[in-house]
Amino acid sequence: MKTFTLLAMLLLTACATNSEVEKRLLAMYEQDQSIRHQQLALTKAITTEGQTYLIDSLIQVIDIQQQIDQRNATFVDSLLQAGLPKELSDSAYHAIWIIIDHANLDMQEKHLSYIRQMAEERKIKFKEYATLYDRIEMKNNRPQRYGTQIIQFGTSNSPQLYLW
């Protein structure tokens, strides 16, 4: 079934117009960001406002987020393998970057060189490439090159930043 789904997606992307691919990528971006905003709001309510009764909702949102990330990553992976349509918008290229950034480590490593190429061609900002590069290094327990991955501890009045 997985093979059939992948083949169907490859055929779809091969036949898709720029407009269709663009719309799909932008919809994926919106869904990606929407679920993450829900997660952040629930996390804040639980951690800073003590609303622990929301933990089940947070777990459910994280599960949905993981499903969305996997579905988006599968589409972008097949799209990159089949070849991107030419002349996508900056927003579509940004969507590709964020989907790869939110994918698993294997996908991130697989497409890092493509993200670098997009940055060199100014289709995305270099800081987006740097973020992905550092995230991969962090996940592999190696030092960052650009210093983009930090965690804030403490209160908002006296935060302490920790560089991974």
Task: Identify what each model region corresponds to.
Residues 1-8:
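Sec-dependent signal peptide recognition
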Residues 3, 50, 69, 155-164:
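Residue-level signal for functionally critical sites in structured catalytic/ligand-binding pockets
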Residues 13-14:
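C-terminal motif of bacterial Sec signal peptides marking the signal peptidase cleavage site
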Residues 17-90, 99-106, 118-121, 126-137:
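Preference for long, solvent-exposed alpha-helical segments and helix-linker "stalks"
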Residues 91-98, 107-164:
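Mature-region segments of soluble proteins
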